[in-house]
Amino acid sequence: MTDSSSPDSPPASRNTFAHHLGMKGFLLMEGLLKLVGMKTLYRLGRAAGAVAWHLLPQRRNIVERNLRIVLDPALRGKELQKLSRENFKRTIANFLCSAKTATLTDEQLKHCVTVGGHEQFAAPVLEGRGQVCAIAHSGNWEALARIRAFYPEVERYGSMYRQFDNPLMEEYVYQRRTERGTQMFSKEGGIKAPMKMLKEGGALGVLSDQFVWEGVYVPFFGKVTGTTPLPALLRKRAGADMVAIAVRTDAPGHWIADMGNVVDFSRSDGSLAGDTIEVNRGLETLIRESVLDVFWMHHRWKSVDRFAPQDKKTAALLENMELKPYRILVAVPRALDEALATVPLIRALKTVRCDMQVNIVCPSAQLG
């Protein structure tokens, strides 16, 4: 167990008035959440999510695009709106309940969360091998920070996380989690310390389903996107096993943590990109169990103002895969000589990535 003076603890920082105000608000929110039962809080969160769906059209568009990619590109209209509204309801409810989960005792936690896949999760650690946990941002995600309550036989459990911008909140959350037996490793601190823990037979959680520009560009639900290679990298270097993990809603105020989905690397070519593809497949299997419990309010398949970096080995891996297209719309000039000048560019675009689909808009006279 670590403490606030350990090498992985948050660095000292000058606290501003805004930091103190934010901390006061955080503590006030926690105090209020303690007064509300979990089932009631979940229902209140759903009501707040329904309101947010109407008030946040930009976020709604993001959620609906993500759901079309995951479920069906043909989804439109009322059916899609119904799904996105339900996702908003669950997301806000899960957010509020996650905040309350941090305040629960271990016994209270066990009344709210059921763990599945106990043996698959614990087996490698009990045999002295590390266990990398590729985590999906879904359901009551705070339950995973408290997972040691369900695994007394697992002596060391750690989590990689992004530090809070507010140093007071950072110190508060860090100390609470470490006091409960979870070792915290900030992403800003590098991978040396978490790697050491894995090699010593610990279990390490890594959030693995967010867009990462500096990552490897491999398919997630059939569409290429920036993906963190960190879980695959840690597994390979530490000689560890891996499970994909997600939390899904079972009933109002109750969740199931699926802990036993062992990631199969037998189809991988052994490259970092190949291994990351298998990590994504493991996450996809769990997410399909409860798509609407996933946090979809972010650009998981973000379109950026430049083409994704790609190496030849990764490109070769993707060549034989069935991928959803990356679409580019090209508007051709009316003047014929100017239109002809765009042909080399259009041909070049087709070679940039194997999932490229170039759609051309041109005057009818230029067809043929």
Residue ranges and their predicted role:
Residues T2-D3, P7, R14-F17, L55, ...:
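Non-catalytic C-terminal accessory region of glycerolipid acyltransferases
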Residues T2-I135, N140, E170-Q175, A308-M321:
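Membrane-anchoring hydrophobic helices of lipid-metabolizing enzymes
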Residues F26, R59, E153, T249, ...:
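Catalytic machinery of carbohydrate-active enzymes
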Residues E107-V113, R162, E179-F185, F220-G222, ...:
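Short, flexible loop segments at the rims of nucleotide/cofactor-binding pockets, characterized by
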Residues V125-E188, W213-V216, V352-C354, N359-C362, ...:
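Catalytic core of membrane glycerolipid acyltransferases/transacylases, capturing the structured
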Residues G130-A134, H298, R327-A335:
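Active-site donor-nucleotide binding/catalytic segment of nucleotide-sugar enzymes
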Residues A134-A136, M160, L207, I245, ...:
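Short hydrophobic segments within beta-strands
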Residues L144-A145, P231, T342, I346:
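Short, highly selective alpha-helical patches that border small-molecule cofactor pockets
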